[in-house]
Design a protein with these regions (language model features):
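An amphipathic, hydrophobic-aromatic interaction surface with interspersed Lys/Arg
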Residues: 1-43, 47-52, 67-156
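Short, hydrophobic/proline-enriched secondary-structure or compact coil segments at domain edges
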Residues: 56-69
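Alpha-helical oligomerization segments
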Residues: 143-181
Length: 181
């Protein structure tokens, strides 16, 4: 969870010909499947798609991430560039110590459009507990990737890979035993 403080500010509303203001507000934000699902319900397009988001869509996603209750909607207009950088860094953070080697990548990049419903499907098919939908999205996606890797059938080594592995093992044994073969 990320906690950010949005400074208070004043503005002039030309429609009502009056001034308005907000107080400094602290927001608790969570980048999760629940947040993405809320956003996709409103905008009817994939959040994780390659299409860039408008400023309005980005601001609305921050609203969807907000856990703090009873927030004045005008507060979101006071988000500074510094706060936005914090939010973007939080969204992009891996939030896990798990890493995958390049060998684990399968050929061409994934072309499927990933929506919240697709991620819910993955959770159901992999028997991932429902509570995980509130995790940071990158942590949840890493768990899904780990489950897929662990459930995948063992890949057979090619003849060449087996020969290279045996050659390396024999070379190591010869070095350890000071033998020539």
């Amino acid at each position: 969870m990320l906690q950010v403080t949005i400074p208070g500010y004043e503005w002039f509303d030309e429609k009502t010909n009056s001034f308005g203001s907000t107080k400094e507000t602290t927001l608790q934000l969570e980048h999760s499947l629940v947040s993405i699902h809320r956003w996709e319900q409103k905008w009817c397009k994939p959040f994780l798609g390659k299409e860039p988001k408008t400023a309005e869509e980005c601001a609305d996603y921050i609203r969807c991430m907000t856990l703090t209750q009873h927030v004045d909607p005008a507060v979101y207009n006071g988000i500074t560039a510094e706060v936005m950088d914090k939010i973007n860094n939080y969204i992009e953070a891996p939030m896990t110590a798990t890493w995958f080697s390049d060998k684990d990548k399968q050929g061409s990049p994934h072309r499927e459009v990933i929506t919240s419903e697709v991620i819910y499907y993955w959770m159901i098919s992999l028997n991932i507990p429902w509570e995980c939908r509130k995790w940071h999205l990158n942590t949840l996606l890493t768990l899904i990737r780990v489950c897929n890797a662990k459930n995948a059938p063992k890949k057979k080594q090619s003849r060449r890979e087996m020969m290279e592995q045996r050659t390396a093992m024999n070379k190591a044994r010869r070095a350890r035993l000071n033998s020539k073969g």
